[in-house]
A protein has these predicted regions:
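Alpha/beta-hydrolase superfamily serine-hydrolase fold, recognizing
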Residues: 1-183
Length: 183
């Protein structure tokens, strides 16, 4: 397996980003006590849709429903009821563990009821580190409201269709690049 591309959506985008960190940063492996089954050399890229990349930013939003949901997700993910106060919360901030081994990544999110600011923060952080980032975010003035999980609406010619097209272009580009490297 030498052309692995990890995909994730919503919480799965966070998990996919963690898989990238495990493969590219031994410090992260030690911090969470998990060894990666894949190496950085095996990774060709990552596709991250609508994900939270800094779980601590999901706390105390002022919305009781979101706060309750976030508290339960954190508890399930980290195994501690008071997870907000534990050491593991530090490991949920993806950008704190990125290295120059981070593979090409496609990051996208809607602009309503999702994690757009976290996606933009991660994309900008990776760009500032010289990483290969393709991102797709939506201006409300041009696209209107684009919600969480928008990418599954691919038949309407709107944001979901654009995401599909951009994702295919990204995958083709990184696959061709990987193929050229291996020749």
């Amino acid at each position: 397996l030498n052309n692995i591309i990890v995909f994730g959506d919503s919480a799965g985008a966070h998990i996919a980003a963690q898989a990238v960190l495990l493969a590219t940063n031994p410090e992260y492996e030690r911090a969470i006590g998990v060894s990666s089954a894949i190496t950085a050399e095996q990774l060709s890229g990552a596709v991250l849709y609508c994900g939270p990349y800094d779980v601590s930013k999901m706390l105390n939003t002022g919305n009781k429903v979101i706060d309750f949901f976030a508290s339960r997700i954190g508890w399930a993910l980290l195994g501690e009821k008071q997870w907000q106060e534990g050491e593991m919360i530090k490991t949920t901030t993806i950008k704190d563990y990125t290295t120059d081994q981070f593979p090409p990544v496609f990051i996208s999110d809607g602009n309503s009821g999702s994690f757009e600011s976290q996606g933009k923060d991660l994309a900008n952080h990776l760009l500032s580190k010289g990483r290969d980032v393709t991102s797709l975010f939506f201006d409300r003035n041009e696209y209107g409201e684009v919600g969480h999980e928008y990418q599954f609406s691919i038949g309407d010619g709107g944001a979901g269709s654009l995401c599909y097209e951009q994702t295919v272009l990204f995958l083709n580009r990184i696959s061709e690049s990987r193929h050229e490297m291996n020749q």
